[in-house]
């Protein structure tokens, strides 16, 4: 009797193990799957940009030579593809008289940045003010408009490196001396490092 009871108990336990496993691997309504996809940037992501550029004057003839510029900027993504930020640049161009035209543009920027894998293609428009100085004339606030296009490679989650070109329009309007009114058009090409956080 004990043996029969033991065999029946063993069969019941074995049958419960066999029926406990789902052999057809079908999804049930209780199964939960999370779609994980990599996005290079999301709302709230930020980056700091550091740039060294050559500055090429476009409308001064031979009066203004090729110069240089350095730029630092802070940008924050408001969506996966769009960022708002602020850039400060220091630029200079020598003149034919061995003098120096210097300018410090400060711009608010909007950037649209599509990407493919680790390659990023930012398109930026900026508007702001510039402090401009030549000989004994200082001009502030001078309007500045700029457009930028770049190509970057994201080498790590926190760093991207690339090249960027910038077209800059800087007018000078004088109320008292209309004969001094002028504008500058500059094209730049630069090497850029960006730290993402």
PLM feature spans:
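Gram-negative (and chloroplast) outer-membrane scaffold detector with strong preference
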Residues: 68-145, 153-161, 193-197
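Hydrophobic secondary-structure block in the mid-to-C-terminal portion of proteins
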Residues: 169-197
């Amino acid at each position: 009797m004990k043996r029969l009871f033991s065999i029946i108990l063993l069969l019941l336990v074995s049958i419960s193990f066999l029926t406990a496993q789902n052999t057809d691997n079908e999804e049930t309504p209780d199964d939960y799957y999370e779609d994980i996809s990599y996005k290079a940037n999301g709302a709230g992501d930020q980056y700091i940009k550091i740039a060294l550029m050559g500055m090429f004057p476009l409308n001064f003839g031979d009066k203004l030579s090729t110069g240089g510029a350095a730029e630092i900027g802070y940008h924050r993504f408001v969506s996966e593809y769009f960022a708002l930020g602020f850039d400060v640049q220091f630029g200079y161009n020598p003149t034919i008289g061995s003098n120096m035209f210097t300018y410090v543009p400060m711009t608010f920027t909007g950037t649209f940045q599509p990407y493919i894998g680790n390659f990023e293609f930012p398109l930026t428009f900026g508007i702001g003010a510039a402090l401009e100085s030549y000989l004994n004339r200082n001009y502030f606030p001078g309007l500045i408009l700029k457009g930028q296009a770049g190509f970057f490679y994201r080498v790590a989650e926190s760093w991207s490196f690339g090249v960027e070109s910038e077209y800059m329009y800087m007018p000078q309007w004088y109320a008292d001396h209309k004969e001094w009114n002028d504008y500058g058009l500059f094209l730049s090409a630069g090497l850029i490092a960006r730290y993402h956080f």
